[in-house]
Amino acid sequence: MLLHLCSVKNLYQNRFLGLAAMASPSRNSQSRRRCKEPLRYSYNPDQFHNIDIRNGAHDAITIPRSTSDTDLVTSDSRSTLMVSSSYYSIGHSQDLVIHWDIKEEVDAGDWIGMYLIGEVSSENFLDYKNRGVNGSHRGQIIWKIDASSYFVESETKICFKYYHGVSGALRATTPSVTVKNSAAPIFKGIGSEETAQSQGSRRLISFSLSDFQAMGLKKGMFFNPDPYLKISIQPGKHSIFPALPHHGQERRSTIIGNTVNPIWQAEHFSFVSLPTDVLEIEVKDKFAKSRPIIKRFLGKLSMPVQRLLERHAIGDRVVSYTLGRRLPTDHVSGQLQFRFEITSSIHADDEEISLSAEPESSAETQDSIMNSMVGNSNGEPSGDATEFCKDAKPESPSEGNGVNSSENQNQEHAGPVEEAAGAMEARDGSNVSEAPEEPGELQDPEQHDTQPTLSAEEVAEGLPLDEDSPSSLLPEENTALGSKVEEETVPENGAREEEMQKGKDEEEEEEDVSTLEQGEPGLELRVSVRKKSRPCSLPVSELETVIASACGDAETPRTHYIRIHTLLHSMPSAQRGSTTEEEDGLEEESTLKESSEKDGLSEVDTIAADPQSMEDGESDGATLCMAPSDCSGGHFSSLSKGIGAGQDGEAHPSTGSESDSSPQQGADHSCEGCDASCCSPSCYSTSCYSSSCYSSSCYSSSCYNGNNRFASHTRFSSVDSAKISESTVFSSQEDEEEENSAFESVPDSVQSPELDPESTNGAGPWQDELAAPGGNAARSTEGLESPMAGPSNRREGECPILHNSQPISQLPSLRPEHHHYPTIDEPLPPNWEARIDSHGRVFYVDHINRTTTWQRPSMAPTPDGMIRSGSVHQMEQLNRRYQNIQRTMATERAEEDSGNQNSEQIPDGGGGGGGGSDSEAESSQSSLDLRREGSLSPVNSQKVTLLLQSPAVKFITNPEFFTVLHANYSAYRVFTSSTCLKHMILKVRRDARNFERYQHNRDLVNFINMFADTRLELPRGWEIKTDHQGKSFFVDHNSRATTFIDPRIPLQNGRLPNHLTHRQHLQRLRSYSAGEASEVSRNRGASLLARPGHSLIAAIRSQHQHESLPLAYNDKIVAFLRQPNIFEMLQERQPSLARNHTLREKIHYIRTEGNHGLDKLSCDADLVILLSLFEEEIMSYVPLQSAFHPGYSFSPRCSPCSSPQNSPGLQRASARAPSPYRRDFEAKLRNFYRKLEAKGFGQGPGKIKLIIRRDHLLEGTFNQVMAYSRKELQRNKLYITFVGEEGLDYSGPSREFFFLLSQELFNPYYGLFEYSANDTYTVQISPMSAFVENYLEWFRFSGRILGLALIHQYLLDAFFTRPFYKGLLKLPCDLSDLEYLDEEFHQSLQWMKDNNITDILDLTFTVNEEVFGQVTERELKSGGANTQVTEKNKKEYIERMVKWRVERGVVQQTEALLRGFYEVVDSRLVSVFDARELELVIAGTAEIDLNDWRNNTEYRGGYHDGHLVIRWFWAAVERFNNEQRLRLLQFVTGTSSVPYEGFAALRGSNGLRRFCIEKWGKITSLPRAHTCFNRLDLPPYPSYSMLYEKLLTAVEETSTFGLE
């Protein structure tokens, strides 16, 4: 009887664990392993200690600012979301009241979500409510928070977010709310050795799926979908189910065209899985035709295999489920039906990968724990459980090398293991088995190079790693099964590799494509992908083993599961259930149609298909590294809490996971196939997977494993596990919306990257052992305490590393990406705030200086006016644009301007605002990094500081890193060929703390070591050693650390190597304009000595005055004179050169003959005098082309357009006769300025004197400029004076004035403009600007500023979208302009234009407009409601729709801006330009760095950097002059602007998106551009000449960007 009772309890426990965790959405990260894939952080507010919320006084809740500021002075008119209380005690407090006051567009589908603090994905809400159907801008809702697995700690910080239903934009966020749960248990930790599993007899089931058909799928906007199925096997949701080789099986069905009721009749798919696995079926639209991409997601189904087995056992072969959705706003409809057949009996698994080192007594101890817990009536862990936590620790922890440890353990336990294996069926599930350990789970990152890897064949066939492994562990059917797994695996990898080689379009980025490492066998890759830390692995096979023990040997699957139901229903807790049979029937019905909103839960991995969370590595992920609290004890304790709570309702008033506001409280606990007694809240109210198990976990940021894969583990809490386990088939969206119920979705999948100091007590030896040479992970569990309330003696941020986890030396940085909402509890500096734009991106607002930035500000106080002077990079970039405009004009104006240039002074930044050296910027960045460490403890801060001072970090983050990279040809080729390496370098350069994540990556180590100079001595405190395999590693005695990276790499002293010094000098000197650089030689005294501390050139000169220059002086002269535009440069300072043909011949002779010619003419007086004027330029000049491409050689006889330094207006790229439509921008520009001068614009004699205060720049300018009349603005000269600063305005102060003013006026601070949807550096008029007080006058003022800058020839540091420039020119917008505003809308109209719509669409000339929440119908033309759209009139319909969409909400603003603009500029003069040319006139032309462009270009469709067509392409681009390159950039990206970070920071519609070239089209087609994706579709032209002509034609003779 006792034996039977133990068996029943074990069965109950395992059934509870299995159902609650395995029924889950698939773990997408298992198959989605692209190098650029973003993984998400999830922050816990407890990690930030800058604010003492627990003990400090409760301040008044501050209102967070929203996306728009509706008033220039006050802040009363911004969107707000407020909560009635900042503290909430579960079961004791009154319900929260959420108030909203939304100024932006609202919708009846808007919803409010409850999130953990720091959660950045809208999908990961804990709960959500619809705001109601009234569509009002103000309202409130009552919110009751119940005890659930989200609140297992004593305090949990949450916030509420208001989302717009249509666009998904975040409207407002509440301050943080602290939820107190007095009933939260406190658990003791378990030693890490107790995580060992009993292998037991895992049961792999072979089954087949066939007869698929779907009914009622969602129809597209204009067309039926082309559905296909993507079916995969994923491990159970919780980490107790390890990733095994059979996971990741994936099959895709054929595409059924143009139907909402597809039937896949001949499709038959076979899979092998465990009962705990999840079968995930996703229905997607292939988008096979030329149709607009609206949303390809049609629905998904995540079903536990065990659920299918139960249906099979009761005779159901054909099953039907309702498709689910991912977000509350997803529109999913339809059902999926298929046949499920078991093709083989349940048989033992051969998996030998997971660790298994559990002592024999472990399982028996668990039984005793179960006994004590079932009998325990309160929510606290029983004494036995506590004793188990203490006693079950091993006496002598194994330490040292992972493989050696494995061998020792195998030898030590060989005997007991064989006994256990032999009696495995007779021990009531208490199995003890010893499996060979997998090195991938044991070895540290540093050991990856030295430890043997387990090959796929060994895994598949179950071969032991060493000879001492007991052979009796391998069942007889292992070989057969292994071969089966191998057969399943090989085609999978092959198919994926083919997909990678083919290249995928943007719509395929949602697919699960594994990035395969070149040169590695596919099979080995499949296994290595699964080599992930499973630190807290409960026995995955206990469920099956216990069931087998209880049920006997000879059993069919049907009787097997019927027996399970019988046992479960006989459990004491099941009989205590209060649910009636009738209620259960209702629950089962509800389960079958339960809301597909929880299908957001179907994406187990939190890396969902959200485009903004992909790319760029902008969003960082986290990999778990489980702390000592073993899940075994945690599960039992949590289970005890659940059982106890069910018995003691008074002690725990709210134990259910359901919300009281939901009508279906009981439905969340229904268990399909079980009677009511099994579904009581006492059974599922609190889960064994509650996050209390993780209270002492630590998480390393995206542990990068040895195969360049991100390894992430997903942790989910209990309630949704239990709910999903009941059924993953959810009710229809309509039901959910009618009920307006709050449900609990996928919780925060990855907990805090830092430990809560109050939840961790631990030992100190860990951090000392982490840095042991060779990277051997400490195996000790001594001194590890369980998380308990009270003071902690573990240093913050440290993490006990288990025997199978990867060690880290410190925690990752918490730098938030700018497109995510920041952690609210991390304070911003005073007078700063974070706002979210209409695209969900976060930018930061400085209310003192009234500027915005994408970079999170630091806490250091900055003197007023310094920040507003702008970044040095931006000012330098603006100066480069000035330089190019001046060069453009130099041909015509060289002589007339030469006299005026002599009187100009070098602008000193208008009093120092624009100055500063790079060294200052670096120290500022360094201090910013240190300040960001404020939330860390002193000890951890010191460790992070040491890491940031390591040679590798200094090298990668140095501003001159790319200069050194270009000079190292072999490293440069490695860098350009490895996408993963680029990703790692970019992440480290953005935040140096990311280096901790990648420091052991083999590719990164080898890459950095390519720069090491082994001839040098090691730095002081460093030592080189050799491990037992002969591999060298380096010991840093200063920081007590070891590394494989050679410290003898360049840039350690902040300076370039000598042979690269001149290039740095050149780049910085050239960042000023040609006119200013010339002042260095002519005005050596006054202007430079006036304020040397703030002069950029003075700073550069002082910084490099001692550095030696490697080239001989004669070589520098020759290189300088070989510039293609040298004659124009020489004439700027010596105008007589134009008439001195003899001197010109001498220069040409030197250009042709080189040093030999210079030696002959070295005594020529005229030549020496001329060269003496350019002494500084010669000394600092180096030909960039030969420096970056050593293989290229300069030929003075070749086309002068081949240099990347060629500027517009100097050369022609083609000798052919210009076509009628060809634009001559240089001629237009010169003619425009000549006519302005002739008509007296800006010529005087009067002056517009603007006296500007730097601290009131915008207001002062507004008042003064708006006071002048139209005539005065047109005729008078402009004169700028900064208050309190001496100096005359010879263009310097005016230049800085427009620079600073444009940075303020055109940024989103005042709500007049907003960042465009395409990127984060172009702006457009904001429809929300109508809420700004006096907004029309502000737009009129903006127009006047644009006009003043134009006629006085100053540039603005602002880039606008193409529709904006068209609006300035009063040109009508066409369909291509819609791409900037609404990509999906544009593609839908494009599809209408390209296809015959006869009998397909039922449209009229009307459009639905939502005004203040009310939807009204508006006619596009008179009688439009009665006019059908046909094939004949669709062109008119498209034109009217485009006009409506472009002008919607900004008509008045545009008219006001045009009024101000044409008050200053004559419209007839401006009309000579088109929209792209006007952008160049207003914002200037920047010199394009071809090397940076090429290095940050991606290729698809078979192209690569060495492809012949690509080589021709870059040769053609190099042949272009700078204007043509700018036109090409405009053609592909939509703007000629390049972020000041370079091409690596180019952005697309949903985040970072580099310039991309894809193989597309026939050779007769012109290249095609996709501006939203920065992609150029380039046909594989057969010759260079054809490519050049086609490319030039596309760039210069097309008026639209997306040429079809």
Swiss-Prot record:
GO terms for molecular function: ubiquitin-protein transferase activity. InterPro entries: C2_dom, C2_domain_sf, C2_HECW, E3_ubiq-protein_ligase, HECT_dom, Hect_E3_ubiquitin_ligase, HECW1_helix, HECW_N. GO terms for biological process: protein ubiquitination. The keyword Repeat applies. Residues 362-380, 398-412, 654-667, 748-762, 803-812 have a biased composition (Polar residues). Residues 871-898 form a coiled coil. The active site is at residue 1572. It catalyses: S-ubiquitinyl-[E2 ubiquitin-conjugating enzyme]-L-cysteine + [acceptor protein]-L-lysine = [E2 ubiquitin-conjugating enzyme]-L-cysteine + N(6)-ubiquitinyl-[acceptor protein]-L-lysine. Residues 435-444, 458-469, 580-589 have a biased composition (Acidic residues). PROSITE patterns: C2, HECT, WW_DOMAIN_1, WW_DOMAIN_2. Gene3D superfamilies: 2.20.70.10, 2.60.40.2840, C2 domain, Hect, E3 ligase catalytic domain, Hect, E3 ligase catalytic domains. Residues 908-917 have a biased composition (Gly residues). Residues 182-318 form the C2 domain. Its EC number is 2.3.2.26. The modification Phosphoserine is found at residues 871, 935, 937. Residues 826-859, 1016-1049 form the WW domain. Pathway: Protein modification; protein ubiquitination. Residues 350-539, 572-604, 642-667, 727-826, 890-936 are annotated as: Disordered. It is an enzyme of class 2 (transferase). SUPFAM superfamilies: C2 domain (Calcium/lipid-binding domain, CaLB), Hect, E3 ligase catalytic domain, WW domain. It is found in: Cytoplasm. Keywords: Coiled coil, Cytoplasm, Phosphoprotein, Repeat, Transferase, Ubl conjugation pathway. Residues 387-396, 494-505, 590-601 have a biased composition (Basic and acidic residues). Interacts with DVL1 and SSR3. E3 ubiquitin-protein ligase that mediates ubiquitination and subsequent degradation of DVL1. This is E3 ubiquitin-protein ligase HECW1. It comes from Mus musculus. The lineage of its organism: Eukaryota, Metazoa, Chordata, Craniata, Vertebrata.
